[in-house]
């Protein structure tokens, strides 16, 4: 989860988020090099009197500043497209969970089970226990097995919402009348927090998401106790 004065991303917990972090660092390096070059040229122009007032054309320079940006864009676009296709790929999900957005709570349905569904509301600040997080805790957590491919179906009952868990690299819009899907897989157990990421009314800030990723045997015990 995020913490005060944090400058970077949350720790990656899924393969997709790890790829996104690598892509961020890759792109940031390119942007840093371009910015350094531009600042160097500007400082050179301001501190020297070297000019080329007699130059009418420079085919070599024009060729370079046409080809070089194209190469840079390709270096950014190729890994970006790779990650985009990885995020859309769904292969043999172990479990399917449907998340429905409401004003202002989430409801979940485990579609592989006959009767396993519940609503998830934020716990008010006055009811928090010691050690619990303000505005992030819910009364019913989404319990999922770790190291398994989970398919999430996301929609809404009323207005636009967005189901987002940053540490897993997830953000899927919840649109009324439309069913969007995404996949998640956690590489380690733990609690992972998210929030609605689409302004949806006065209580938009009070729609937290809590995923509890556990080993498969504990998930089976939990699902049996919920039926």
Curated annotation (Swiss-Prot):
Chief subcellular location: mitochondrion
Catalysed conversion reaction: 4 Fe(II)-[cytochrome c] + O2 + 8 H(+)(in) = 4 Fe(III)-[cytochrome c] + 2 H2O + 4 H(+)(out)
NCBIfam families: CoxB
Function statement: Component of the cytochrome c oxidase, the last enzyme in the mitochondrial electron transport chain which drives oxidative phosphorylation. The respiratory chain contains 3 multisubunit complexes succinate dehydrogenase (complex II, CII), ubiquinol-cytochrome c oxidoreductase (cytochrome b-c1 complex, complex III, CIII) and cytochrome c oxidase (complex IV, CIV), that cooperate to transfer electrons derived from NADH and succinate to molecular oxygen, creating an electrochemical gradient over the inner membrane that drives transmembrane transport and the ATP synthase.
Cellular location(s): Mitochondrion inner membrane
Family designation: Belongs to the cytochrome c oxidase subunit 2 family.
GO molecular function: copper ion binding; cytochrome-c oxidase activity
Membrane disposition: Multi-pass membrane protein
Broad EC category: translocase
Quaternary structure (record): Component of the cytochrome c oxidase (complex IV, CIV), a multisubunit enzyme composed of 14 subunits. The complex is composed of a catalytic core of 3 subunits MT-CO1, MT-CO2 and MT-CO3, encoded in the mitochondrial DNA, and 11 supernumerary subunits COX4I, COX5A, COX5B, COX6A, COX6B, COX6C, COX7A, COX7B, COX7C, COX8 and NDUFA4, which are encoded in the nuclear genome.
InterPro entries: CcO_II, CcO_II-like_C, CcO_II_C, Copper_CuA, Cupredoxin, Cyt_c_oxidase_su2, Cyt_c_oxidase_su2_TM_dom, Cyt_c_oxidase_su2_TM_sf
Residues binding Cu cation A1, per UniProt: 161, 196, 200, 207
Gene: MT-CO2
Cofactor note (record): Binds a dinuclear copper A center per subunit.
Names of the cofactor(s): Cu cation
Transmembrane intervals: 15-45, 60-87
Modification sites for Phosphotyrosine: 218
Protein name as catalogued: Cytochrome c oxidase subunit 2
UniProt keyword Phosphoprotein, yes or no: yes
Listed GO CC annotations: mitochondrial inner membrane; respiratory chain complex IV
Residues the record lists as binding Cu cation A2: 196, 198, 200, 204
Keywords: Copper, Electron transport, Magnesium, Membrane, Metal-binding, Mitochondrion, Mitochondrion inner membrane, Phosphoprotein, Respiratory chain, Translocase, Transmembrane, Transmembrane helix, Transport
The protein's Enzyme Commission number: 7.1.1.9
Topology feature Mitochondrial intermembrane, residues: 1-14, 88-227
């Amino acid at each position: 989860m995020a913490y005060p004065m944090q400058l970077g991303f949350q720790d990656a917990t899924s393969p997709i988020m790890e790829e996104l972090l690598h892509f961020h660092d890759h792109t940031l390096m390119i942007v840093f090099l371009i910015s350094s070059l531009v600042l160097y040229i500007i400082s050179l122009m301001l501190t020297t009197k070297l000019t080329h007032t007699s130059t009418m054309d420079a085919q070599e320079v024009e060729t370079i500043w046409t080809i070089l940006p194209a190469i840079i864009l390709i270096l950014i676009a190729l890994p970006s497209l790779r990650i985009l296709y990885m995020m859309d790929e769904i292969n043999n999900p172990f479990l399917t969970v449907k998340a429905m957005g409401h004003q202002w709570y989430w409801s979940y349905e485990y579609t592989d089970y006959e009767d396993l569904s519940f609503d998830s509301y934020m716990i008010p600040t006055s009811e928090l226990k010691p050690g619990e997080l303000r505005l992030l805790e819910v009364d019913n957590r989404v319990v999922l097995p770790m190291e398994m491919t989970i398919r999430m179906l996301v929609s809404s009952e009323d207005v636009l919402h967005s189901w987002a868990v940053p540490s897993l690299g997830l953000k899927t819009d919840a649109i009324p009348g439309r069913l969007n899907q995404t996949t998640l897989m956690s590489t380690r157990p733990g609690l992972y927090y998210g929030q609605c990421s689409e302004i949806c009314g006065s209580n938009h800030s009070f729609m937290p998401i809590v995923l509890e990723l556990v080993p498969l045997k504990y998930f089976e015990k939990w699902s049996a106790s919920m039926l």
